Swiss-Prot record:
Biological-process GO terms, alphabetical: photosynthesis; photosynthesis, light reaction
Function recorded in the entry: NDH shuttles electrons from NAD(P)H:plastoquinone, via FMN and iron-sulfur (Fe-S) centers, to quinones in the photosynthetic chain and possibly in a chloroplast respiratory chain. The immediate electron acceptor for the enzyme in this species is believed to be plastoquinone. Couples the redox reaction to proton translocation, and thus conserves the redox energy in a proton gradient.
Protein name as annotated: NAD(P)H-quinone oxidoreductase subunit 1, chloroplastic
Residues spanning the membrane: 27-47, 98-118, 129-149, 165-185, 203-223, 253-273, 297-317, 340-360
Complex formation: NDH is composed of at least 16 different subunits, 5 of which are encoded in the nucleus.
Domain of life: Eukaryota
UniProt-listed Enzyme Commission number(s): 7.1.1.-
Membrane topology label: Multi-pass membrane protein
PANTHER family the UniProt entry points to: NADH DEHYDROGENASE SUBUNIT 1, NADH-UBIQUINONE OXIDOREDUCTASE CHAIN 1
Swiss-Prot/TrEMBL keywords: Chloroplast, Membrane, NAD, NADP, Plastid, Plastoquinone, Quinone, Thylakoid, Translocase, Transmembrane, Transmembrane helix
Length: 360
């Protein structure tokens, strides 16, 4: 009986140990996801503050200064205000489409962050088709905008949704062709492999120098995908009031506001990964890989800092562009996408393919 009781206790303790391991395993699954979401939220708050400060500097006026030191908490105050506002719904609108549209726009952009390498193998999902996964997921966002415009039962909202869909289709193709050129140079569709391929040759190995035409096209297409000036036709204030956002209020309006900055941040991160060497420091006699070998935590921190520094450099260019260039007409926007960017990006892809074939 003593042996039997001991065996039962051993089995029970083993079962408890296994259940504890499962619980800890589940916790450790959510830790990186929570860390990524927290970092994204912080990044968006910083972008909002930067945009207000930069726009104030360009327009020679005082920016936000009351909410926190230097107005750094202004975005948080605005978000809190929208959170407690009433959610209004159009009486004759399509309620399911009206409610689901903002969520689709935000979730599709959030999923794209899973393939971004912030440092050496510090990526939520290192997939072999990571770059194409981003393109596929980001193509879902305009569907949410179109649903929002149609579900609002408002002519301005519907026209804004149609413009968003047309603009996305027009600039998604040149952007994809530029990504194909990068994948040919790197012989991979993984974002980690693309960064490592650029780190072999240091600063001059960046795809910025190997693909200057593709970089310019990707830059323009990214701004158009983010619907930033001079490409903000879907929500042109003078023509469409607020476009597909016209009938929204409260937290749903705030979701569109967040989605635009999430899209801007993810576009800047992909510019860094594809063209600016990612976490690679690219300074002679200083190798980021040596830092990882000496101290992994220090090397990872340095890699994150380098990635974010390059990202916010591109963000500064995007914000400055918004406040310096006039808005295009709809026909000019479509002509630019279909008649100029598409043929040039296709020619760039064919040229890259030819060079790769001759170099074999």
């Amino acid at each position: 009986m003593i042996i039997y009781a001991t065996a039962v206790q051993t089995i029970n303790s083993f079962v408890k140990l296994e259940s504890l391991k499962e619980v800890y395993g589940l916790i450790w699954i959510f830790v990186p996801i929570f860390s990524l979401v927290l970092g994204i939220i912080t990044g968006v708050l910083v972008i909002v503050w930067l945009e207000r400060e930069i726009s104030a500097g360009i327009q020679q006026r005082i920016g936000p200064e009351y909410a926190g030191p230097l107005g750094i908490l202004q975005a948080l105050a605005d978000g809190t205000k929208l959170l407690f506002k009433e959610n209004l719904r159009p009486s004759r609108g399509n309620t399911p489409l009206f409610s689901i549209g903002p969520s689709i726009a935000v979730i599709s952009i959030l999923l794209s962050y899973s393939v971004i390498p912030f440092s050496n193998h510090l990526v939520l999902a290192d997939l072999n088709i990571g770059i194409f996964l981003w393109i596929a997921i980001s193509s879902i966002a305009p569907i949410g905008l179109l649903m929002s415009g149609y579900g609002s039962n408002n002519k301005y909202s519907f026209l804004g949704g149609l413009r968003a869909a047309a603009q996305s289709i027009s600039y998604e193709i040149p952007l994809t062709l530029c990504v194909l050129s990068i994948s040919l140079l790197s012989n991979s569709l993984s974002t980690v492999d693309i960064v490592e391929a650029q780190s072999k040759y240091g600063f001059w190995g960046w795809n910025l120098w190997r693909q200057p035409i593709g970089f310019i096209i990707f830059l323009i297409s990214s701004l158009a995908e983010c619907e930033r000036l001079p490409f903000d036709l879907p929500e042109a204030e003078e023509e469409l009031i607020a476009g597909y956002q016209t009938e929204y209020s409260g937290i749903k309006f705030g979701l569109f506001y967040v989605a635009s900055y999430l899209n801007l941040l993810i576009s800047s991160l992909f510019v860094t990964v594809l063209y600016l060497g990612g976490w690679n420091i690219s300074i002679p006699y200083i190798s980021i890989l040596e830092l990882f070998q000496r101290d992994q935590i220090f090397g990872t921190t340095i890699g994150i800092f380098i990635t974010l520094a390059k990202t916010y450099l591109f963000l500064f260019v995007s914000i400055a562009t918004r406040w310096t260039l006039p808005r295009l007409r709809m026909d000019q926007l479509l002509n630019l996408g279909w008649k100029f960017l598409l043929p040039i990006s296709l020619g760039n892809l064919l040229l890259t393919t030819s060079f790769q074939l001759f170099s074999l």
